[in-house]
Swiss-Prot record:
Protein name, per record: Endoribonuclease YbeY
Predominant location: cytoplasm
InterPro entries per the UniProt record, alphabetical: MetalPrtase_cat_dom_sf_prd, YbeY, YbeY_CS
Keyword Repressor recorded: no
Entry keyword set: Cytoplasm, Endonuclease, Hydrolase, Metal-binding, Nuclease, Ribosome biogenesis, rRNA processing, Zinc
HAMAP family registered for this protein in UniProt: Endoribonucl_YbeY
Amino acids binding Zn(2+): 113, 117, 123
Job description of the protein: Single strand-specific metallo-endoribonuclease involved in late-stage 70S ribosome quality control and in maturation of the 3' terminus of the 16S rRNA.
Compartments (UniProt record): Cytoplasm
An annotated Gene Ontology molecular function: zinc ion binding
Organism: Acidovorax ebreus (strain TPSY) (Diaphorobacter sp. (strain TPSY))
Lineage, uppermost ranks: Bacteria, Pseudomonadati, Pseudomonadota, Betaproteobacteria, Burkholderiales
Enzyme class: hydrolase
Domain of life: Bacteria
Amino acid sequence: MALNQLSLSLQFARDAEATAHRATLPRHAVARWIRHALAVDAEITVRIVGAEEGQRLNREFRHKDYATNVLTFDYQQEPVAVADLVLCAPVVEREAREQNKTLEEHYAHLLVHGTLHAQGWDHETSEQDAQEMEVYETAILQELGFADPYAA
C-alpha cells in the first residue's frame, strides 16, 4: 500500500507538561501514524501543549471552557489536506492512565482521530458517522500494530 505524502511540523510548547512528552513522540512515529490515516497528501502541524494553552484554545474556538485531548483546525481538505492538530499533554496522559493505555497508544489514536477530522470525517453529525469513524480508526490502528482503542 502506497502512503500519501506528508509535510509535518512537530512542535512542543515551552511548557513542562508538553515537553515531558517529547520522548514519547519521536517525529518518525508521529509521521507514520498520521500517514496511515491519510487519503490525500497533507501538510500538518502537530502541537503538543499544556493545560493552560489547551483550555484557552478550546474556549476560544469551541466555546468550551476546559482543556480537551485533541483539537483539529482544518483549513483545506483537497487536493492537499492542510491542518493543525493540537494535543493537550496532561489530558492525554490522564486519559491514557484512566483507560489503561500507554501514552504511545493514546497519542497514536488521537493523531489518527485528528487526521481523519482534517479530511472531513466527523463523529458529531450522527451516530452512523460516529460508528463509521470508530471502525475506520480501529482498522488504521490495528494496521499500525495497536489494539482497538474502543475495546472495553
